[in-house]
Amino acid sequence: MYLISFVLMLVCVLVSVGFFTLMERKSLGYIQFRKGPNKVGYMGILQPFSDGMSLFIKEQLFPMNSNYLIYLICPILGLVQSLFIWVLFPFYVNCVEFDLGLLFFLSCSSMGVYGLMICGWSSNSMYSMLGCIRSVSQAISYEVSLSMILLGFFLLIDSYNFMDYFYYQKFVWFSILSLPMCFCWLSCCMAETNRTPFDFSEGESELVSGFNVEYGGGMFALLFISEYLSIIFICLVSCIIFFGSDFNSLFFYIKLIFLCFFFIWVRSTLPRFRYDKLMFLAWKCYLPISLYYIYFFFSLKSLCFYHFFL
């Protein structure tokens, strides 16, 4: 029963990725004063399934000098890594509440760097390798700030369980108590998922499409799905940590949709950053702010519970 329920949840998650791409294309269309996809099905609602079919039935070509087996396996491993992190999502039949959910999330999200690196290396292409190096350095840089932000809230709550974050936000959200930290978190999430304005793996002028430049058809679709799976799960974690959401309420899913739309909105409005400014932002701005908040939360905890240390 557990296996059936988990597989059913993964199917629902994969379908949600399709409709998330439809929402993105529709939103970008209306923001740019055009219609977006509206031909397949009623108002284009079947467009994701049409795109998926057209990608997976294409002929798969392999670069002559690529490492064939690793090149073939890498997108599948990237998708498995993105799906594996959804074990953290609690649902009724198999309510998995990890006591170490925070550490599990950090471990799984940091594993995505290896997928980027192997994809760029196995293609044996100069452009994909260059995009891979930039993506990996960006992901590792922002992973540090992301971990420090989560460490600060761990010091405040004394728990790695995501459900405890909801219990501590029944009266006021953490996004209101620590607004700068919330902005830092959202920026780090965009950099972690290679989204605009931090999408340096896809610099069209010099890198074509980044680390996945040699992939096409079904292999590209797997990389695309894994990227959007990560975006949806990052939005879900943001809802839990900063917006006090209960999984059993409708408001949780409304907040999740609004956060997903926020990622789309930023993509449609902001230009791409310069790479040196990106690194400056990670190491000189976000990391000090997160360290200051760690010190602040630790001092607050010490003042409130100082009698335990006597």
From Swiss-Prot:
Keywords: Electron transport, Membrane, Mitochondrion, Mitochondrion inner membrane, NAD, Respiratory chain, Translocase, Transmembrane, Transmembrane helix, Transport, Ubiquinone. It is a multi-pass membrane protein. Its EC number is 7.1.1.2. The chain crosses the membrane at residues 3-23, 69-89, 100-120, 137-157, 171-191, 223-243, 246-266, 278-298. Disulfide bonds: none annotated. PROSITE patterns: COMPLEX1_ND1_1 (PS00667), COMPLEX1_ND1_2 (PS00668). GO terms for biological process: aerobic respiration. Its main location: mitochondrion. It is an enzyme of class 7 (translocase). One of its GO terms (cellular component) is mitochondrial inner membrane. It is found in: Mitochondrion inner membrane. It holds the Pfam family NADHdh. GO terms for molecular function: NADH dehydrogenase (ubiquinone) activity. The keyword Disulfide bond does not apply. InterPro entries: NADH_UbQ_OxRdtase_su1/FPO, NADH_UbQ_OxRdtase_su1_CS. Coiled coil: none annotated. It catalyses: a ubiquinone + NADH + 5 H(+)(in) = a ubiquinol + NAD(+) + 4 H(+)(out). Core subunit of the mitochondrial membrane respiratory chain NADH dehydrogenase (Complex I) that is believed to belong to the minimal assembly required for catalysis. Complex I functions in the transfer of electrons from NADH to the respiratory chain. The immediate electron acceptor for the enzyme is believed to be ubiquinone. Belongs to the complex I subunit 1 family. This is NADH-ubiquinone oxidoreductase chain 1. The gene is MT-ND1.
